[in-house]
């Protein structure tokens, strides 16, 4: 069932199904709570499952300023209080994994499942940094009085050629947020997590590669966290959807 509530002045839309022990599902960039539909169906018989549209996605309002992942975590801490959900198991995909880790580091989760999660700062090629620096130089040059009127049109054309699909599809405000969160390093956050954490990864994930999951597993184990990495061979960044029945079975066993 779709519901709406106001949290920190923002209207947020979310799906809620079932009764029992609480489960919070946090989707990835460019997705919404509806992407968890099959997972919700698989868990709702024994659990109260909530899948929000993260602010800026789906039917939820966009953040009023450039939020960091910590700001999103603040928001969801208040959201959990608003819907009276305590100590949920949090399942996070991609960018939703960042928020899940932040909430877990604050002792707001009983357990965590991260599937193809973001959070390990990427190592880019020289050509990537060349694009970044050329973009910044172009942006500065276009601020000159003679070019100011054409600035946004030129930048939009450049972004269309060089930006990712998610970046190009986002609003200006969400683009700024994306640029901010992509630069965050979650190793320090991982070191603060104490609850059992399961990692589920597609072996062919090119957005957040399997090596990211291996790094997370290593950091968690070094800090004495009960953790394991399960690899879905031949699957991509959306491994949880590509093998949904298997993913649901794993979640049920872990929860």
Give residue ranges: language-model regions.
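Alpha/beta-hydrolase fold catalytic core
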Residues: 1-23, 44-47, 85-86, 110, ...
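Active-site loop/oxyanion-hole signature of alpha/beta-hydrolase fold enzymes
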Residues: 7, 13-15, 51-91, 249
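Conserved HGGG/HGGXW glycine-rich cap/lid loop of the alpha/beta-hydrolase fold
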Residues: 10-59
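Flexible "cap/lid" loop of the alpha/beta hydrolase fold
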Residues: 98-105, 109-143
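Conserved alpha/beta-hydrolase catalytic His-Asp/Glu region
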Residues: 114, 125, 140-195
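Short beta-strand/loop motif that positions the catalytic acidic residue
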Residues: 193, 199-201, 205
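Short alpha-helix in the alpha/beta-hydrolase fold that links the catalytic acid
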Residues: 195, 209-219
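Catalytic histidine-centered segment of alpha/beta-hydrolase-like enzymes
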Residues: 235-244, 248
């Amino acid at each position: 069932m779709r519901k709406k509530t106001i949290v920190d002045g923002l209207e947020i839309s979310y799906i809620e199904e079932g009764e029992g022990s609480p489960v919070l599902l946090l989707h990835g960039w460019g997705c919404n709570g509806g992407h968890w539909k099959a997972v919700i169906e698989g868990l709702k018989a024994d659990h109260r499952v909530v899948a929000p549209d993260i602010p800026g996605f789906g039917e939820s309002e966009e953040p009023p300023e450039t939020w960091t992942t910590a700001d999103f975590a603040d928001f969801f801490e208040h959201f959990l209080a608003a819907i009276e959900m305590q100590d949920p198991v949090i399942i996070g995909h991609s960018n939703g994994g960042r928020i899940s880790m932040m909430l877990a580091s604050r002792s707001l989760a009983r357990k965590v499942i991260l599937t193809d999660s973001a959070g390990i700062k990427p190592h880019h090629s020289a050509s990537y940094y060349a694009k970044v620096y050329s973009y910044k130089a172009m942006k500065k040059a276009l601020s000159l009085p003679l070019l100011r009127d054409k600035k946004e049109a030129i930048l939009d054309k450049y972004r269309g050629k060089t930006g990712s699909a998610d970046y190009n599809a986002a609003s200006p405000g969400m683009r700024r947020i994306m640029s901010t969160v992509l630069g965050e390093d979650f190793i320090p956050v991982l070191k603060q997590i104490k609850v059992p954490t399961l990692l589920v990864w597609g072996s062919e994930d090119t957005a957040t590669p399997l090596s990211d999951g291996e790094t997370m597993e290593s950091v968690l184990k070094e800090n004495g966290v009960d953790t394991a990495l399960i690899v879905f061979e031949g699957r991509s960044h959306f491994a949880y959807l590509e093998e949904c029945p298997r993913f649901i079975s794993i979640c049920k066993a872990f929860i």
